[in-house]
Amino acid sequence: MNTPDPWSSPEVQFCFAAANSSCPRKARPALVVCAMYLIMIGAIVMTMLGNMAVIISIAHFKQLHSPTNFLILSMATTDFLLSCVVMPFSMIRSIESCWYFGDLFCKVHSCCDIMLCTTSIFHLCFISVDRHYAVCDPLHYVTQITTRVVGVFLLISWSVPIFFAFGLVFSELNLIGAEDFVAAIDCTGLCVLIFNKLWGVLASFIAFFLPGTVMVGIYIHIFTVAQKHARQIGTGPRTKQALSESKMKATSKKESKATKTLSIVMGVFVLCWLPFFVLTITDPFIDFTTPEDLYNVFLWLGYFNSTFNPIIYGMFYPWFRKALRMIVTGTIFRSDSSTSSLHPAHP
């Protein structure tokens, strides 16, 4: 007697077997399904724990209560919410190719997806503004980047994506002109976010290309200024103080670390999000023929940016490494732990 291979593709199945209008469920070998669940659950857990560590560190330790760190705290909160509210449901949809949670929650999930991803990108943009003042105008940094200014940054970072996401999805402006395609694929268990040609371009511009261009421009300027400062130090007056060997080594190390950090920041950001937003623009122009699996790969690549954020903007800071050790070892539960000295106080 032949026994079915548990690792082979199953027969054609439907999301809701009892529904006549059910969407077909994508057939995948069980081994592939297991691998996808392991990878995506791992990404969700890493995103959740990494950003939770940043949130606890900044919220608990008083020495970290600075305007700059409030930006990082807010971004970590955004990425944490993404891992809790959006990614688990996207995981099931991506693997099972079915939506089991109803039409209303489909819209809410789509809104939260757009909102939180855009909010995270906006935070990255404003953090680049903060770093610009810190590196390019350090003498006036404290007076320029105040708690009030950061409050404005946070207000923009949250309010614009909220109004944009919920307004667009519930008004269905993104579907105008794509009604025939929507009707053709409509079935029970479907939850896809479709953009027409106009909103494919506008949404990508608002959520990625505008803040991304600002961010790239700022970091290029920061890099240029940092290199200029390094050359000025190297060609300055040959005084005993200016030519201090220890100072020159420290400066060289600092500039090298800054260059490395900026390269990683920009590389990860562009690598994670550029493919998805290019696809968002091009898909309506090729009659929505992008393969579903390719769309999911690019979507999750974008999600991974929220996984990497606490590593880039947290673990590169010595205060975070020390705070993380205190969290892991339980030292944080001491009554006086909130006043512990974490050096340096500012990133």
UniProtKB/Swiss-Prot annotation:
Residues 59-69, 130-149, 219-260, 318-347 are cytoplasmic. The chain crosses the membrane at residues 38-58, 70-90, 111-129, 150-170, 198-218, 261-281, 297-317. It comes from Mus musculus (Mouse). It holds the Pfam family 7tm_1. It comes from the Eukaryota. This is Trace amine-associated receptor 4. InterPro entries: GPCR_Rhodpsn (IPR000276), GPCR_Rhodpsn_7TM (IPR017452), TAAR (IPR050569), TAAR_fam (IPR009132). Glycans are attached at residue 20. CDD domains: 7tmA_TAAR2_3_4. The lineage of its organism: Eukaryota, Metazoa, Chordata, Craniata, Vertebrata. Residues 1-37, 91-110, 171-197, 282-296 are extracellular. GO terms for molecular function: 2-phenylethylamine receptor activity; G protein-coupled amine receptor activity; trace-amine receptor activity. It is a multi-pass membrane protein.
